[in-house]
Structures are given as structure tokens and as C-alpha cells.
Swiss-Prot record:
GO biological process: one example: mitochondrial cytochrome c oxidase assembly
Record keyword Disulfide bond present: yes
Organism in which the protein naturally occurs: Mycosarcoma maydis
Motif Cx9C motif 2, residue range(s) on this chain: 51-61
Signal peptide (UniProt feature, chain positions): none
Protein name per its UniProtKB record: Cytochrome c oxidase assembly protein COX19
């Protein structure tokens, strides 16, 4: 191409995308699987090892919907992924489901063992007080050190525990 001359595209060569590059999911056909994976990643503090079964499901969805070429999962790096029927995977899936339920504004008592900061009825097993979750002296005496940190807005280190209101009825629960 030279200056002053109209551009020519004869030198332009079309090449296929590199392996791993595939079209965007404009219609949202696999959005729910992708969202579940992203929630799992957030819940596990960016430890993708606990969410590999979900990334495998996402790639399988993309292959099923024609958004990427069919390929063996071994070639995509999933040779060592544990079967979803295993206990650890079930626990991770349950935790991701609990995370998803909390992110959709459902209550802490929807059949899953989810606890919110300030919730005296959940996994923390604290005795009830008149001012549950308020941070009052009566409330603090019923809590252990981790629960006090939760009441002060710190990150909870318990399984399936989220910061927000005690029952997530206002829909403003903030996922940690």
C-alpha cells in the first residue's frame, strides 16, 4: 500500500481464528452456565480448581449450541476433571447454587444452608437475641470472634455465607 493511492485489499489474507477463539454468545444461549461459573469463581475467591466442572459444562454448552467446534474434553484440558457425581463436586455445586440463590435475592432459609452476616438462625448457630444483627452488646455476647467480624462488615470465611441483611428480603444483599 502506498501513499496517495486508494487502498487495495489484495494483500489482505483472511485466516481462521486461533484455537480457543470462538464467536460471542450474542443470544445468551449459554449465559446461565457462564453465570454459574462466574458465581462459583467469586465464591471460591478466584480458585478455579473448585469450579472446573462448571467450566467444562460451559464449554460443552458452547459445543452443543454450535458456538465452538466439537472437540474432545481431553484436548481442552479436562482430562483430570472429577465426575460431577463425586461428593466434593456436589458440595461445590451446592455452594454455587446457594451463591446463585443469594444473588437473586432469595432468603437465607430457602432449603439451602446459607448464612448472612447478622443472621442468628443460620450456620453460625448463635442464640437468638432481641436485636439480632444489630451489633448491640447483647447481640455481641452471643457471637464468637468470626461472627463479630461479620457483624462489622468483614468478609465471612464460612461456607455459603454472605454479607447483607439477615434474611435478604430487601434484595440488597451484597455477595462477598
Amino acid at each position: 500500500m502506498s501513499f496517495g493511492r486508494p487502498p487495495t485489499f489484495s494483500d489482505f489474507k483472511v485466516s481462521p481464528p486461533e484455537r480457543g477463539s470462538f464467536p460471542l454468545d450474542h443470544d445468551g444461549e449459554c449465559k446461565s452456565v457462564m453465570q454459574e461459573y462466574m458465581n462459583c469463581i467469586k465464591y471460591n475467591r478466584n480458585d478455579n480448581g473448585k469450579c472446573r466442572h462448571l467450566s467444562r459444562a460451559y464449554l460443552q454448552c458452547r459445543m452443543d449450541k454450535g458456538l465452538m467446534e466439537q472437540d474432545n474434553m481431553d484436548n481442552l484440558g479436562f482430562k483430570d476433571v472429577v465426575d460431577p457425581a463425586s461428593t466434593e463436586t456436589k458440595n461445590a455445586a451446592a455452594a454455587a447454587a446457594a451463591y446463585r440463590a443469594a444473588s437473586q435475592g432469595r432468603g437465607a432459609h430457602s432449603g439451602l444452608a446459607v448464612s448472612y452476616a447478622g443472621d442468628t438462625h443460620g450456620v453460625e448457630r448463635h442464640t437468638n437475641s432481641a436485636k439480632a444483627g444489630s451489633g448491640s452488646a447483647a447481640d455481641e455476647s452471643n457471637r464468637d470472634a468470626n461472627a463479630r467480624a461479620n457483624a462489622n462488615g468483614h468478609v465471612s470465611r464460612q461456607d455459603a455465607s454472605y454479607a447483607g441483611d439477615s434474611h435478604a428480603q430487601s434484595g440488597t444483599a451484597r455477595l462477598v
